[in-house]
Structure formats: structure tokens, C-alpha cells
From Swiss-Prot:
The lineage of its organism: Viruses, Riboviria, Orthornavirae, Pisuviricota, Pisoniviricetes. It is found in: Virion; Host cytoplasmic vesicle membrane; Host cytoplasm; Host endoplasmic reticulum. Keywords: Host cytoplasm, Host cytoplasmic vesicle, Host endoplasmic reticulum, Host membrane, Host mitochondrion, Host nucleus, Host-virus interaction, Inhibition of host innate immune response by virus, Inhibition of host MAVS by virus, Inhibition of host RLR pathway by virus, Membrane, Viral immunoevasion, Virion. Residues 9-98 form the 9b domain. CDD domains: SARS-CoV_ORF9b (cd21955). It holds the Pfam family bCoV_lipid_BD. It comes from Severe acute respiratory syndrome coronavirus. Belongs to the coronavirus group 2 protein 9b family. This is ORF9b protein. Homodimer. Interacts with host XPO1; this interaction mediates protein ORF9b export out of the nucleus. Interacts with host MAVS. Interacts with protein ORF6.
């Protein structure tokens, strides 16, 4: 057994790379309008260190990339692949971690 693997950390705590990309499924999109095949949207994340772990939606505008955070939006998160900050779409995810 590898001694480096004795402490198992939940996957959510592995969000330590600002280039990680997440698949976001908004619950209102998945359940609204009676649609059974709502496709998840993929957003890169922006990682912020120094505060409690949280996840929220944010929209890009002309003033700030962090404007209009939607912290109350229920979402389902799945890590997918790496992305660069240049690939940020109009909507992205802001992650804060201790």
C-alpha cells in the first residue's frame, strides 16, 4: 500500500488548479419545461484561495468577470478536463477553497 494514499480526500477538495474545467448542470434547467434531455453546460473555473470552499455561477460583463455571482443556484458538478482562462465563456464558475 502506498503511504501517500492513506488519507482519502473527497473529489471536491481536489479543485486546486485554476485550469480545471467542470460540467455544470443547473437543476432548474434539468427539471424545467418538462425537458428530459437537458444537456449539461461546461464551464472552466476560477479558483480563489484563502476562503471557505464554495461554488457559484458568475457571468462575464464589461466591468468584471466576477459580477453577478449566483450562489443560490442549485448545481451538480462533475470534473471533466483542463481548460485555459482564455477559453472562459460568458458564464463560468468561481471556486473558493480554504
Amino acid at each position: 500500500m502506498d503511504p501517500n494514499q492513506t488519507n482519502v480526500v473527497p473529489p471536491a477538495l481536489h479543485l486546486v488548479d485554476p485550469q480545471i474545467q467542470l460540467t455544470i448542470t443547473r437543476m432548474e434547467d434539468a427539471m424545467g419545461q418538462g425537458q428530459n434531455s437537458a444537456d449539461p453546460k461546461v464551464y472552466p473555473i476560477i479558483l480563489r484561495l484563502g476562503s471557505q470552499l464554495s461554488l457559484s455561477m458568475a457571468r462575464r460583463n464589461l466591468d468584471s468577470l466576477e459580477a453577478r455571482a449566483f450562489q443560490s443556484t442549485p448545481i451538480v458538478v462533475q470534473m471533466t478536463k483542463l481548460a485555459t482562462t482564455e477559453e472562459l465563456p460568458d458564464e463560468f464558475v468561481v471556486v473558493t477553497a480554504k
